[in-house]
């Protein structure tokens, strides 16, 4: 007996539900999403499929929309981009967002502050480039002058060497010959000795005479004199007065015996 229960009342496997479109789809599918753009959310209205501000102010750019709305206003922005082509619309919206963000960061200067900073950087870089170019020109001039002065310097050095060699030749010609008798030139010490020795001229004549005799005779005479005279006066007691030469044999012998004392006096 067939049962009267329908088979479709309690299905064994439920049917899959369709997926909702994601938020990254085109603007035509934005109305099917639960999140509206930042402009529509601020105005508390439903985001239309042809919303002009939805591509530029999505729901996660609420702060940027507030900056643009505070500076320009939603109605003015819509009027600006309404009659523009898509490339021009993108450029206009990029400019509006940049200017509004700059005003929010710097309420006094805004974009003008950024322009001043860029102009200062340009001027500083231009001055630095000018200084570098001046230094390069200076170094090039120095290198050019040095390159042209090298032959002149070499010629001047050769002239100096030739003049120096000629002056040396003249000095050598005017100098004393190597075979000139040097004994004719008296040194100052020798001249002083000759002048001071005039007081002992008589004694020097006797010394030269005594040096010509035999040394053995002098030794023998000295020994005999020591035997005869035991008390010999020291050298300091010898009188420095000059005695006149007396050609007497006994006096000559006495002067011969006084040879050591005379040599000591002259050496002192």
Curated annotation (Swiss-Prot):
Annotated region described as Disordered, given as residue ranges: 1-31
Similarity comment: family membership: Belongs to the LOB domain-containing protein family.
Domain of life, source organism: Eukaryota
Name of protein: LOB domain-containing protein 22
InterPro entries, A to Z: LOB (IPR004883)
Pfam families attached to this UniProt entry: LOB
Organism encoding this protein: Arabidopsis thaliana
Biased composition (Low complexity): 22-31
PROSITE patterns for this protein: LOB (PS50891)
Gene name of the record: LBD22
Domain named LOB: residues: 35-136
Signal peptide feature range: none
């Amino acid at each position: 007996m067939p049962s009267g229960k329908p088979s479709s009342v309690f299905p064994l496997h439920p049917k899959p539900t369709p997926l909702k479109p994601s938020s990254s789809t085109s603007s035509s599918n934005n109305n099917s999403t639960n999140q509206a753009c930042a402009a529509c959310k601020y105005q508390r209205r439903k985001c239309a499929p042809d919303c002009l501000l939805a591509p530029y102010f999505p729901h996660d750019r609420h702060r940027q929309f507030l900056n643009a709305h505070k500076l320009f206003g939603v109605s003015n922005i819509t009027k600006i981009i309404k009659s523009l082509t898509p490339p021009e619309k993108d450029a206009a919206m990029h400019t509006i967002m940049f200017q509004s963000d700059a005003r929010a960061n710097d309420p006094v200067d805004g974009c003008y502050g950024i322009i001043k900073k860029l102009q200062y950087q340009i001027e500083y870089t231009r001055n630095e480039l000018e200084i570098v170019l001046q230094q390069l020109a200076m170094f090039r001039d120095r290198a050019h002058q040095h390159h042209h002065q090298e032959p002149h310097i070499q010629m001047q050095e050769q002239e100096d060497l030739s003049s120096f060699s000629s002056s040396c030749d003249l000095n050598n010609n005017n100098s004393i010959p190597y075979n000139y008798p040097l004994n004719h030139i008296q040194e100052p010490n020798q001249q002083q000795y000759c002048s001071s020795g005039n007081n002992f001229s008589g004694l020097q004549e006797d010394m030269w005479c005594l040096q010509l005799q035999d040394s053995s005779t002098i030794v023998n005479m000295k020994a005999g004199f020591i035997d005869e005279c035991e008390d010999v006066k020291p050298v300091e007691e010898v009188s420095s007065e000059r005695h006149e030469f007396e050609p007497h044999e006994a006096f000559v012998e006495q002067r011969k015996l006084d040879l050591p004392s005379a040599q000591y006096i002259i050496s002192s």
